[in-house]
């Protein structure tokens, strides 16, 4: 069910990050070296999840693995226990909560019209549903973390935190972000561009679907422009 996927990606997945934040408060803040294996594991897990996204043919699985890769960055930032790291981790959890939920919503919009989640069978929607293609572009750009979105701010804080802690981590972070951009663009091009393989008539989009997307994108942009709204 699409509602379950949206709640799982937007809220339940972030509860683990919140639990780690609460647990780290009772641990000594100066002993980050003892957590080195966990930080490396989190970053390596993010890269592996990103690589898994690149080879996915199922649209819903691709979005699910995307959420896992972003949580790897969140865990690494939390474990370092710096103010910038915690701020970046919380901001990324909020930003990616909106983004992943919107992606699942768009995937369901496509599925209701094609009755398949295979990427190659869902292409060609830019001619049939241009407004939906616009939403796909907006949300994928947020997933890539372009400025001035909250995703960009949070990833910049996490990158600064990890680089100050150990400059070598910039290699893993850079690789992770490069692959994130690759699969996000691949997802957009695969689902929207090219000739449509369907010969049957496609149902137009409904106002409720555009309203649902607006309720994801507009709050995220408002928080990006004015973070004081949630502080």
From Swiss-Prot:
- How is the protein disposed in the membrane? Multi-pass membrane protein
What is this protein's function? Core subunit of the mitochondrial membrane respiratory chain NADH dehydrogenase (Complex I) that is believed to belong to the minimal assembly required for catalysis. Complex I functions in the transfer of electrons from NADH to the respiratory chain. The immediate electron acceptor for the enzyme is believed to be ubiquinone.
Q: By what name is this protein known?
A: NADH-ubiquinone oxidoreductase chain 4
**Would the keyword Cell membrane be found if you checked this record's keyword annotation?**
no
- Transmembrane stretches in the record are 1-21, 34-54, 63-85, 89-111, 128-148, 169-189
* Keyword Transport among record annotations: yes
Per its record, the protein catalyses: a ubiquinone + NADH + 5 H(+)(in) = a ubiquinol + NAD(+) + 4 H(+)(out)
Any one annotated GO CC term: mitochondrial membrane
- What UniProt keywords are attached to this protein's entry? Electron transport, Membrane, Mitochondrion, NAD, Respiratory chain, Translocase, Transmembrane, Transmembrane helix, Transport, Ubiquinone
Its Gene Ontology molecular function terms?
NADH dehydrogenase (ubiquinone) activity; ubiquinone binding
Q: Which family does it belong to?
A: Belongs to the complex I subunit 4 family.
GO biological process entries = ATP synthesis coupled electron transport; electron transport coupled proton transport
The record's EC number reads 7.1.1.2
Which locations, inside or outside the cell, does it occupy? Mitochondrion membrane
Organism from which the protein derives: Deinagkistrodon acutus (Hundred-pace snake)
- Top-rank EC class of the record's enzyme: translocase
A Pfam family name for this chain?
A: Proton_antipo_M
């Amino acid at each position: 069910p699409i509602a379950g996927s949206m709640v799982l990606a937007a809220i339940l997945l972030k509860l683990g990050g919140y639990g780690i934040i609460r647990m780290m408060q009772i641990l000594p803040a100066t002993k980050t070296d003892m957590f080195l294996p966990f930080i490396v594991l989190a970053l390596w897990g993010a890269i592996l999840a990103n690589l898994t996204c690149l080879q996915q043919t199922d649209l819903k699985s691709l979005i699910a693995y995307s959420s896992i890769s972003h949580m790897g960055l969140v865990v690494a930032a939390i474990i370092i226990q710096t103010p910038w790291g915690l701020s970046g981790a919380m901001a990324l959890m909020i930003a990616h909560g909106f983004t992943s939920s919107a992606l699942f919503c768009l995937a369901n919009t496509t599925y209701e019209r094609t009755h398949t989640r295979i990427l190659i069978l869902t292409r060609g929607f830019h001619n049939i549903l241009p407004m939906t293609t616009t939403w796909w572009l907006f949300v994928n750009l947020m997933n890539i973390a372009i400025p001035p979105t909250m995703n960009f701010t949070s990833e910049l804080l996490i990158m600064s935190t990890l680089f100050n802690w150990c400059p070598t981590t910039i290699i893993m972070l850079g690789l992770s972000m490069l692959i994130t951009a690759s699969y996000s663009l691949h997802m957009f091009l695969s689902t929207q561009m090219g000739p449509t393989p369907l010969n049957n008539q496609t149902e137009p989009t409904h106002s409720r679907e555009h309203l649902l997307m607006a309720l994801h994108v507009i709050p995220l942009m408002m928080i990006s422009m004015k973070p004081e709204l949630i502080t």
